[in-house]
Amino acid sequence: MPGIKEIRTKIKSVQNTRKITKAMEMVAASKMRKAQERMRAGRPYANKVREIAAHLMQANPEYNHPYLQQREIKAVGVVLVTTDKGLCGGLNTNISRLTLNRFKDFEAQNIQVRATAFGNKGLGLLTRIGTKLVSQETQLGDKPDLDRLLGAIKVQLDDYLEGRIDALYVATTRFVNTMKQEPVFLRLLPLASGLNDPFQSGLEHLESTTEVKSDYGWDYIYEPDAKSVIDDLLQRYVEGLLYQAVAENMASEQSARMVAMKAASDNAKKVIGELQLVYNKTRQAAITKEISEIVGGAAAV
């Protein structure tokens, strides 16, 4: 049985650890609320762009944008969104496992993969497995910087337009609620005809073709022309989806970290209680032994 001093040292150590995890839990809770606000704030913009783009495409059915064209899949681009830091439960493990399974499917079909990494954890994974990396962004902080995101993703969009890839996927963690985060592997390009929002529907692929019904019966007047307007709207729509993927992952990260730190704090409290019980028993045994020795010594005298 360990001595009293050793047990007291262990209790002090666990108490210090609990203070750290409790502080991290509170910080994560604060960041989680802000991340959720940013995530939800981006949805109205994406919804309106999607709605307008769908209306314009219905009004101009003769124009088939490259983002809508179906091709034979020979190569794909994958944007892997992970965190820069750990201590967030199984968040990165789950999305990494899903991504590796999809990579195996691509390999079985002899489909090449060109990847973009957002976050240190994803970058490390792609580097270890030898995936061709075309762009990367790490140390994104607590608030996604749109300029940095678009700089990294432009490589993939250019590859798609120039035919180097035939589809573009994003692997991220969809925020469901504070206690649940769902790893998803979503197809961004080619776009489905209905331009559905994957982060609201929770679908693994953008296969749904639900059409947006227009309430407007008049013709549009375009400046400079219909093609330019649709091109710009679809570009912004895809960029909005990618921003949303990163925002969803950040909200999921803070939620998972808060839950993980709360579990760590609770476990530390339990360990402290168990150590305190052992300490009390050890101290009681030592006192009893000392009393017995004193009584025995007095009797001998």
Swiss-Prot record:
PROSITE patterns: ATPASE_GAMMA
Compartment(s): Cell inner membrane
InterPro entries in alphabetical order: ATP_synth_F1_ATPase_gsu, ATP_synth_F1_gsu, ATP_synth_F1_gsu_CS
TM region(s), chain numbering: none
CDD domains the record matches: F1-ATPase_gamma (cd12151)
Gene Ontology terms describing biological process: proton motive force-driven plasma membrane ATP synthesis
Membrane topology listed for this record: Peripheral membrane protein
Cross-referenced PANTHER family: ATP SYNTHASE GAMMA CHAIN, ATP SYNTHASE SUBUNIT GAMMA, MITOCHONDRIAL
Subunit details: F-type ATPases have 2 components, CF(1) - the catalytic core - and CF(0) - the membrane proton channel. CF(1) has five subunits: alpha(3), beta(3), gamma(1), delta(1), epsilon(1). CF(0) has three main subunits: a, b and c.
Protein name: ATP synthase gamma chain
Organism: Bordetella avium (strain 197N)
Taxonomic lineage: Bacteria, Pseudomonadati, Pseudomonadota, Betaproteobacteria, Burkholderiales
Gene symbol of the encoding locus: atpG
